[in-house]
Amino acid sequence: MANFTAADVKRLRELTGAGMLDCKNALAESDGDFDKAVEALRIKGAKDVGKRAERATAEGLVAAQGGALIELNSETDFVAKNAEFQALADQIVAAAASSKAADVDALKAAKIGDTTVEQAIAELSAKIGEKLELRRVAHFDGTVEAYLHRRAADLPPAVGVLVEYQGSGKDSDKEAAHAVALQIAALKARYLSRDDVPEDVVASERRIAEETAKAEGKPEQALPKIVEGRLNGFFKDAVLLEQPSVSDSKKTVKALLDEAGVTVTRFVRFEVGQA
């Protein structure tokens, strides 16, 4: 008996863009496990699967203040443009900065005047007639640089980056951190260093590289070198410090940070509509 339904097939198809039969077979092979099904589709050559699987259906905005970054969702971009919605986001991120809330539940309980964040969201939701959701929050205690990016001039920021860093206290420290924030916004780094990549992710990428190389008919004796090359390509794409700098493609982000005497300790990137 299959451990998935027609609705599961539809969901996987929406996430990946793969064909219905391919999705059905991938779910069957993975016993209904979505992550394994996505991996199976990638092995079979659906090259855009990983990126499409990150997408979610949501509108809204990101906001930053102090060491805090939030994502507040709405159902439509019409509401995202609403002045009251944007004002609420400003109040919520201010509450996040002052309360240092570590997660959404803690932030929902934080105060905005005489009410809570959760109550304020519910009240505006009832007034506007659209579901609103506080999707996520991040807070860093150290020295931070924030960057917000708009997809269109008439829309609020949809991409937000928060970078925590250490330097020598020079003005150039902030400039270097800002350049890194722009880099993260543009190239979507997922990890700071290679050591931060979870072992299961590395194992999955290695397995995908090996299986795709075999499917391409590569010589058996050449597989180890090919797999390592593709794995290094993954690190170059996903790891911030190993990415080529957008400002100087001949140097990595790590090289430019070393030259500036700045150390990035952590970062977070939120994008409306993505996981």
Curated annotation (Swiss-Prot):
CDD domains: UBA_EF-Ts. One of its GO terms (cellular component) is cytoplasm. It is found in: Cytoplasm. InterPro entries: EF-Ts_dimer_sf (IPR036402), Transl_elong_EFTs/EF1B (IPR001816), Transl_elong_EFTs/EF1B_dimer (IPR014039), Transl_elong_Ts_CS (IPR018101), UBA-like_sf (IPR009060). Residues 76-79 are annotated as: Involved in Mg(2+) ion dislocation from EF-Tu. One of its GO terms (molecular function) is translation elongation factor activity. Keywords: Cytoplasm, Elongation factor, Protein biosynthesis. Pfam families: EF_TS (PF00889). HAMAP family: EF_Ts. Belongs to the EF-Ts family. NCBIfam families: tsf. Associates with the EF-Tu.GDP complex and induces the exchange of GDP to GTP. It remains bound to the aminoacyl-tRNA.EF-Tu.GTP complex up to the GTP hydrolysis stage on the ribosome. This is Elongation factor Ts. It comes from Mycobacterium avium (strain 104). The gene is tsf.
